[in-house]
């Protein structure tokens, strides 16, 4: 099971949190969900060069808070905050709600699976050999503190007639262990031979559940 399912979805509610934090009744749920998808697609398309790792959306009454996790906050914010203000106005026009945009910097993009996948995809588009791109990326991630990494490239690799999947991995990636903090990312490279899919799994170590504090008057000195 752990081999097939999205590692993030499998761990939601255990060691990972939801990307969208809001509640809605039956009438509004589908509309808000579609709105979330549109917001994410718009931001990703507009700011692809900024290295967007993930987008969190929180809702309260008629307000929407969008947290953008990016490797290059300078591109998102712009000179004097002009870019982020323009983005906020576009989102307000799209949703007809009050929008607050929060920028969160990704300190180590080398161990962020989504950014790693997008980096490999951009290298493939520049005609860099897929094995070289995979190997260099794995070594860089392990140097920056990843416990293990696994990469899969699928498609007409090196312009081959028949599509295939090539794997490269180092370290350990325990997909079945629910307390294992595994990041997952997916990107597509648009080459002259067609699309090449890139999947990345990065193991960052185990997340241990917090120890329960003793009740008042018990176990304390």
From Swiss-Prot:
InterPro entries: KH_dom, KH_dom-like_a/b, KH_dom_type_2, KH_sf_prok-type, Ribosomal_S3_C_sf, Ribosomal_uS3_bac-typ, Ribosomal_uS3_C, Ribosomal_uS3_CS. This is Small ribosomal subunit protein uS3. It comes from Desulforamulus reducens (strain ATCC BAA-1160 / DSM 100696 / MI-1) (Desulfotomaculum reducens). Binds the lower part of the 30S subunit head. Binds mRNA in the 70S ribosome, positioning it for translation. Pfam families: KH_2, Ribosomal_S3_C. Keywords: Ribonucleoprotein, Ribosomal protein, RNA-binding, rRNA-binding. Residues 39-107 form the KH type-2 domain. The gene is rpsC. One of its GO terms (molecular function) is rRNA binding.
